[in-house]
Amino acid sequence: MNRGVVIAGSLTGLAILAGWLAARAPATAVSRDPAPSAEDVVKLRTLSMILLSRNDNDPRLDKDFNELSPGAKALFRGMYGKLPPERRNERGTIVYLLGRNLASAEDWAFLASVAGEPPCLSLADCSKDAPTAEGHLGDEVTLAYPSLVALKSAEAALTAGDARIRTKARSVVEAGRTSKMPAVLRLSGRLEAEL
């Protein structure tokens, strides 16, 4: 079966499951994330369709995901966690959208966790080294894409005037300094030097 069809089915299934869970599951005291609203589920479905289309220039990315609610952000973080690690572009897109909507401790913790993720060694299988032909700079950046996007979001926050936001952004940079990915180490090192 075509790998793209399998991935498309998986993303669609995730969006349907999220909608079903949002409609059925009550919010519990243990969950820090609020139950997603119907609007949150629509945003997740829209994101799923954009990711399926593989269109990084879809104008909805710049207009439909501003001011995400806590419920939508929780759904997006859930989708990120369910995507295979090899889906670097899709995962990076989710980090990009969440990085534009930083408000809560969970938002910053998510960015820090992405910045410090284990390395993805190959687009075919993150757990296995790539053949030597794949090891040029472009692939190095692609393999580190979600972490680099997290660091760029932190970089934008570092320019903010609010000391509390800068402190939170520093935690993302510090997480990037623990990475084993050369591109992430370079960017986090540059950001750390600028602090």
Regions inferred by a protein language model and the residue ranges of each:
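Hydrophobic membrane-insertion alpha-helices, especially the h-region
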Residues: 5-24
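Internal alpha-helical scaffold/solenoid segments in large eukaryotic proteins
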Residues: 11, 21, 78-83, 87-98, ...
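N-terminal leader/linker segments that initiate helical-solenoid repeat arrays
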Residues: 26-62
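Eukaryotic acidic, Ser/Thr-rich intrinsically disordered low-complexity regions
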Residues: 28-36, 170-195
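Amphipathic alpha-helical scaffolding segments comprising HEAT/armadillo-like alpha-solenoid repeats
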Residues: 31-45, 67-82, 103-126, 163-174
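Short coil turns that connect the paired helices of HEAT/ARM alpha-solenoid repeats
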Residues: 38, 50-53, 81-87, 116-121, ...
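Structural detector for internal amphipathic alpha-helices that build alpha-solenoid repeat scaffolds
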Residues: 49-68, 81-82, 90-102, 129, ...
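Extended amphipathic secondary-structure runs
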Residues: 148-181
